[in-house]
């Protein structure tokens, strides 16, 4: 009984446990299903959010892609535009170059046509001359036959009359024939000489005309004054300085006369030496720009500009040598030639004159079949002696010959320099050509001025007289030659000798120069003591 009860109790417990477990399992299943639903909902939400974010990213990427594409397109267009501009510029440059080449070819073709025409004309002239000579030869042959016939007739006549022997008759006839032929030949020689002279004169004129037409001569009249513009008239007082110290220092150091008058905002620098005048002009302009105008600054700038002018002289010479096609000229000769930029001959700039002579000589030499490069070189150097003739004794021809020999120029160049004024005989065609080119350049209307050259020579002679006295360091002709200012060596000339020197200079000027009015002689003795504090 109790066992049954126990078994029943166990069964009841099992049933209850099963029911309890079933209820729990059902509850857990419902919870699981709920969680599954929640998870699915969350997944759906996350997927929607992800899809939205993905859409946003896609849209953003599309916008960025469009922006990048637009920028790339703009950059490509800009690159294309730049490339097109470069191509256009290159094409334009090439087209311009082609035009220049075409122009040069056209000019060369025209020149060749002219030469061809000249050669054709000369050939025709020679053919005519040859025909004329042939005709004359035939005439002479016919005349000779006639003379022989006359001889035979005379011989027969003489033999007929029997007064003379055959040998004597022959001698008489030969003498008469020789006399007749001599007159005929002399007449024909004179005619031929006259014809050759006329033709040679015409050819020479043609060559000179061609040379003159191909030279674009330029000429700027040389002056003895340079004008410097001032910012205002108050600068005139500063230029003069206290008690005239600045202007006296400026004139003493540069050798140029400073003219300050009523002309507004202008100072005039007057001097016959172009190098001194250029140094003075540069110094004055630098003083005005700098604003510091006092004797020490003036001295500093004058020395600086002297060095600058020396560099300019070399540049002028090199540029001129390259212009006439002589770049292999010795550097020292180039520098000496550069000094001619600041020299004049009868008012004509000597460097420009030398370049013009070189070009004319080259053209004429080319027309005559001579060495054009050598002719240009000889023409360029023919007046080189004028660059230093005021420093070295002798004429500019002698000095030029010495320079040419010193720097081993060809003998043709040396002889050209020596003979271009007819001092010695020309030994080559080039020497004659250069002499003709020199005369042609000098004779060109407006190229030279006798009055200016005479004035400059008078000032130069005035300075030479002063420099000839012992103890004189340098001298400057000022006031258009109305004053000579002499700087003496204080170690050689004492104070009591200054007045005597001025008197001697005055007497020599009176005895050796012709001049209008009076000339003031000023002798300056300046003693400087310089030391340095350390």
Swiss-Prot record:
Statement: the UniProt record of this protein carries the keyword Secreted: no
The protein's enzyme class: hydrolase
Gene Ontology biological-process annotations: mRNA catabolic process
Segments for region (Disordered): 109-141
Domain HD stretches: 350-443
EC number: 3.1.-.-
Protein task: Endoribonuclease that initiates mRNA decay.
Protein name according to UniProt: Ribonuclease Y
Organism (species): Streptococcus pneumoniae serotype 4 (strain ATCC BAA-334 / TIGR4)
Species lineage: Bacteria, Bacillati, Bacillota, Bacilli, Lactobacillales
């Amino acid at each position: 009984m109790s066992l049954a009860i126990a078994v029943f109790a166990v069964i009841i417990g099992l049933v209850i446990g099963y029911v309890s477990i079933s209820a729990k399992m059902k509850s857990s299943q419902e919870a699981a299903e709920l969680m599954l639903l929640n998870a699915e909902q969350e997944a759906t939400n996350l997927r929607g959010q992800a899809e939205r974010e993905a859409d946003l990213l896609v849209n953003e990427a599309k916008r960025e892609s469009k922006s990048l594409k637009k920028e790339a397109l703009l950059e490509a267009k800009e690159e294309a535009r730049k490339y097109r501009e470069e191509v256009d510029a290159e094409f334009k440059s090439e087209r311009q170059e082609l035009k220049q080449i075409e122009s040069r070819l056209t000019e060369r073709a025209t020149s060749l046509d002219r030469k061809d025409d000249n050669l054709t004309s000369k050939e025709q002239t020679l053919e005519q001359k040859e025909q004329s000579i042939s005709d004359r030869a035939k005439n002479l042959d016919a005349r000779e036959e006639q003379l022989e016939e006359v001889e035979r007739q005379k011989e027969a006549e003489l033999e007929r009359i029997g007064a003379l022997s055959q040998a004597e008759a022959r001698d008489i006839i030969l003498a008469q024939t020789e006399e007749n032929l001599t007159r005929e030949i002399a007449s024909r020689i004179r005619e031929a000489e006259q014809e050759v002279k006329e033709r040679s004169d015409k050819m020479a004129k043609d060559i000179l005309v061609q040379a003159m037409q191909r030279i674009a001569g330029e000429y700027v009249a040389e002056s003895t004054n340079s004008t410097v513009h001032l910012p205002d008239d108050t600068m005139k007082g500063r230029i003069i300085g206290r008690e005239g110290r600045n202007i006296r220092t400026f004139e003493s150091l540069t050798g140029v006369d400073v003219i300050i008058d009523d002309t507004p905002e202008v100072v005039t620098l007057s001097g016959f030496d172009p190098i001194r005048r250029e140094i003075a002009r540069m110094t004055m302009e630098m003083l005005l720009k700098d604003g510091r105008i006092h004797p020490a600054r003036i001295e500093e700038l004058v020395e600086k500009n002297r060095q600058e002018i020396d560099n300019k002289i070399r540049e002028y010479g090199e540029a001129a040598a390259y212009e006439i096609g002589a770049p292999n000229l010795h550097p020292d000769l180039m520098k000496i030639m550069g000094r001619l930029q600041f020299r004049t001959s009868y008012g004509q700039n000597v460097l420009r004159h030398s370049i013009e002579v070189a070009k004319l000589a080259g053209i004429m030499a080319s027309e005559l079949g001579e060495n054009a490069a050598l002719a240009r070189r000889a023409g360029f150097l023919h007046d080189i002696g004028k660059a230093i003739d005021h420093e070295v004794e002798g004429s500019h021809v002698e000095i030029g010959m010495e320079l040419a020999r010193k720097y081993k120029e060809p003998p043709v160049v040396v002889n050209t320099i020596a003979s271009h004024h007819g001092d010695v005989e020309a030994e080559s065609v080039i020497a004659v050509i250069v002499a003709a080119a020199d005369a042609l350049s000098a004779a060109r209307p407006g190229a030279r001025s006798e009055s200016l050259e005479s004035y400059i020579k008078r000032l130069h002679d005035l300075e030479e007289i002063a420099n000839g006295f012992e103890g004189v360091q340098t001298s400057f002709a000022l006031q258009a030659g109305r004053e000579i200012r002499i700087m003496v060596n204080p170690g050689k000339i004492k104070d009591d000798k200054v007045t005597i020197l001025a008197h001697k200079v005055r007497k020599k000027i009176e005895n050796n120069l012709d001049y209008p009015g009076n000339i003031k002689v000023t002798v300056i003795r300046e003693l400087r003591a310089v030391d340095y504090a350390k």
